[in-house]
């Protein structure tokens, strides 16, 4: 490359006399592509003769500038002739300071101001465009100048600032004769951007600040408007005027995009808007270029720098690795990730050099890479290494760019796919220079160095950033901590001996009860299922209130941006500041508890939840596509042939206009199809197969292209439709490659195991249509699906039992539920409709209801029911049990999931279902077998002792307890007798202080360990809690709606009617 091809640099030398002419000397700059442009130090002198000219003419200078319009001129006043100051860029030379002598020429101080105003931090991304800034003046070799902290501005006011400290330039010889190479100084200390000092004569230079609307280029004339600002990109500028006092960010980006397209018309980019960054020039800040994040950043006279990034900004993930090293703590300190105490005498944990946070060694591999590098006080013993010297301005830059980084993370999430597509670009801050613990690794003591202590790997950051974020609230419950733990929200100690605080049962986030209301809704889910994502919502931009979301907490639930104040050792009332054993620390902490911080009064029992054994009603959103294709068809009512694109799914057949549209001509639900058959073998029929419904018959004559494969295609269509009509594909009964022992499968026409006539699945499919995607529940012997009766359209629940899953000795278990359902007939028991048996399966058809009692409890406002609603439901349950016990039928698996509701009202009718565990037990008989769900079983069953019908009454007591409190009554870790005898444990003030004593007495009568002391159904119905006028009135309203009196008795009418007259109550059941 020829020297003339380099960007040009002008040198100006002025004696102290103000009448001297300004002489310019042309320099060419040399840059190496392998070295960052702001680290370049070698400049080649292009003309040695020009350097000797100290009194050149102004016309020479003007001619040089006109000849080289891309060159820069920088002037500087000095008491010596050889002072030097210049400024350039690597990729394209800026002409911000270029002036023709006949135009408005800047004063030397103006040049100084312009040169210093373009100084930016090395941390800023604008260095991707290669800004360079050097200042030099002659002095003796090796000399160092002291800093001047005070200076006088042009108004005579004294101000404070920082100064340049430079090395001495050393001329070196080059191979080419007559040429010299200068090693330019290296900037060590960043100065105040608007202040330049001359140390040669200890004089102070006052920079010139130009007016806001002063134009430096006439590339575009400004328009008249209320808001005027300028766009700049390299040597190009443009003035923009808009109406109003603000411009929207979208309009500003559009103006910048149009500006770039105008000045670079030959450069085409399909998604240029993704690469554009907008900065404003702010001379008052340390970083001159400030990222524009809001419309208020652009004011009248603002200079907007348009920067084109190297990668799309919506694919960048900002990663700030922690600088961890082993640390010995002299006072008790807590982990900022899990909140537990760092145990040990020495080397208890890890401390981040950047942000000062403290972690367990076991937590090091789980913490997010979100260090903010803002430790309040950096130890003076550890100096800044060159690789980390640019961290000085890190806080200011991140403060101004915090929200832009968050928005970049939000935009980056959908860019990563599972199929191996391009992953988002990762921007790692300069804290991490390749070593495992950060840039200061070599400056730590050797004994504290470690190559294993680092945050989670980058692939986890990518997976976390691209993961869909939802506002999932924490599920807090009272927890007793065995180790001293701090609240991860307020960073204060959780005090007490037991039940010190609240812990999320999913992500194990710990906090005070009073702080639980202020914790962000960012639960990360079960920690056992996702070990490596225990708090990975770093830089989450989903929440609009980012200032709150980025508040001072870090924990297992969601590890936010690291806080400025880490978990410091407890002081004052929170603990003794002196080092000592953990025992004395805990004792001091407990003795200093304030009065207002009392131990939580909530129950430590397990919250009510759906037991794994039963499924909640689910339904897939998208039906499975079974077959599709073009079909030509007609009906028995219309002979005109029509062509449509048929799609067969689990719900029906849909006829679309074409393959891609969503508009359809007609839909045939599967429950309306009565039969599908091929055409007769004779050649008289002009169709391939027919679909018979209750309204008409569809004849399929083929596909639009009548080929040889039409008959084969017709066969596949009939097979697919018949498969869709079949109830459910039977599950395999093969285990480990060998078929298990099964019941003897009778042939068609024989009597089945349950005494029912064997029927084919085709016959069953003609009566009922089962929706395989609508699973209502799953029990011991089978799965319950939703279905519909084809003829009358009644919705039913079909329990499908696979006989091949049971060995021969379990045949009685298959027969028990069907026999009980056939035997009972009561409004409080689910209605049995029909039972059909095929060669390998049994179909039990029952009525379908709206939901279950558990769903009603969980969906209530407080997570529990009121006493009035609970009394209403329990009264119906007791009446159904009274009927079953009269028939010597014990349910044995009574729980809210098996109590169905026929409506979504506040006072619905309930019915008992799922008699898979039911037993026939006499009044004085006992059974010994495995039955029921452990959470609702009586102690005698859990201890494998004999049980009788009082087993159901224990289950009723548990149901009443969970309905009123929303939690299970017992904790599995303690003996059940001890828990029952401990009234404080069983009935904590929250919420039992709001519940009547009669309700507690009713529960105590049912939850009796001794069966002889447990309430019977009759005694429970006559208990005082179940005897009040409001309950009787509500039940009478229900009976009126059902049309049958099945809960209350006529003998009670006289008593309650007298109550109405005595209290002047108007009955609502009439």
Curated annotation (Swiss-Prot):
<dbReference type="InterPro" id="IPR046349">
    <property type="entry name" value="C1-like_sf"/>
</dbReference>
<dbReference type="GO" id="GO:0050830">
    <property type="term" value="P:defense response to Gram-positive bacterium"/>
</dbReference>
<keyword id="KW-0597">Phosphoprotein</keyword>
<dbReference type="GO" id="GO:0006606">
    <property type="term" value="P:protein import into nucleus"/>
</dbReference>
<comment type="similarity">
    <text>Belongs to the protein kinase superfamily. CAMK Ser/Thr protein kinase family. PKD subfamily.</text>
</comment>
<dbReference type="InterPro" id="IPR002219">
    <property type="entry name" value="PE/DAG-bd"/>
</dbReference>
<feature type="compositionally biased region" description="Basic and acidic residues">
    <location>
        <begin position="152"/>
        <end position="163"/>
    </location>
</feature>
<feature type="domain" description="PH">
    <location>
        <begin position="624"/>
        <end position="726"/>
    </location>
</feature>
<dbReference type="GO" id="GO:0008270">
    <property type="term" value="F:zinc ion binding"/>
</dbReference>
<dbReference type="InterPro" id="IPR001849">
    <property type="entry name" value="PH_domain"/>
</dbReference>
<feature type="modified residue" description="Phosphoserine">
    <location>
        <position position="925"/>
    </location>
</feature>
<feature type="zinc finger region" description="Phorbol-ester/DAG-type 1">
    <location>
        <begin position="321"/>
        <end position="371"/>
    </location>
</feature>
<dbReference type="GO" id="GO:0004674">
    <property type="term" value="F:protein serine/threonine kinase activity"/>
</dbReference>
<dbReference type="GO" id="GO:0004672">
    <property type="term" value="F:protein kinase activity"/>
</dbReference>
<dbReference type="GO" id="GO:0004697">
    <property type="term" value="F:diacylglycerol-dependent serine/threonine kinase activity"/>
</dbReference>
<dbReference type="GO" id="GO:0050829">
    <property type="term" value="P:defense response to Gram-negative bacterium"/>
</dbReference>
<dbReference type="GO" id="GO:1902554">
    <property type="term" value="C:serine/threonine protein kinase complex"/>
</dbReference>
<dbReference type="GO" id="GO:0005829">
    <property type="term" value="C:cytosol"/>
</dbReference>
<feature type="region of interest" description="Disordered">
    <location>
        <begin position="200"/>
        <end position="222"/>
    </location>
</feature>
<dbReference type="Pfam" id="PF00169">
    <property type="entry name" value="PH"/>
</dbReference>
<dbReference type="InterPro" id="IPR011009">
    <property type="entry name" value="Kinase-like_dom_sf"/>
</dbReference>
<keyword id="KW-0832">Ubl conjugation</keyword>
<dbReference type="GO" id="GO:0009898">
    <property type="term" value="C:cytoplasmic side of plasma membrane"/>
</dbReference>
<keyword id="KW-0862">Zinc</keyword>
<dbReference type="GO" id="GO:0045087">
    <property type="term" value="P:innate immune response"/>
</dbReference>
<dbReference type="GO" id="GO:0008340">
    <property type="term" value="P:determination of adult lifespan"/>
</dbReference>
<dbReference type="InterPro" id="IPR011993">
    <property type="entry name" value="PH-like_dom_sf"/>
</dbReference>
<keyword id="KW-0863">Zinc-finger</keyword>
<feature type="domain" description="Protein kinase">
    <location>
        <begin position="770"/>
        <end position="1026"/>
    </location>
</feature>
<dbReference type="InterPro" id="IPR008271">
    <property type="entry name" value="Ser/Thr_kinase_AS"/>
</dbReference>
<feature type="region of interest" description="Disordered">
    <location>
        <begin position="537"/>
        <end position="583"/>
    </location>
</feature>
<dbReference type="GO" id="GO:0140367">
    <property type="term" value="P:antibacterial innate immune response"/>
</dbReference>
<dbReference type="GO" id="GO:0005886">
    <property type="term" value="C:plasma membrane"/>
</dbReference>
<keyword id="KW-0963">Cytoplasm</keyword>
<keyword id="KW-0460">Magnesium</keyword>
<dbReference type="InterPro" id="IPR020454">
    <property type="entry name" value="DAG/PE-bd"/>
</dbReference>
<feature type="zinc finger region" description="Phorbol-ester/DAG-type 2">
    <location>
        <begin position="473"/>
        <end position="523"/>
    </location>
</feature>
<dbReference type="GO" id="GO:0042803">
    <property type="term" value="F:protein homodimerization activity"/>
</dbReference>
<feature type="region of interest" description="Disordered">
    <location>
        <begin position="42"/>
        <end position="77"/>
    </location>
</feature>
<feature type="active site" description="Proton acceptor">
    <location>
        <position position="893"/>
    </location>
</feature>
<keyword id="KW-0808">Transferase</keyword>
<feature type="compositionally biased region" description="Basic and acidic residues">
    <location>
        <begin position="55"/>
        <end position="69"/>
    </location>
</feature>
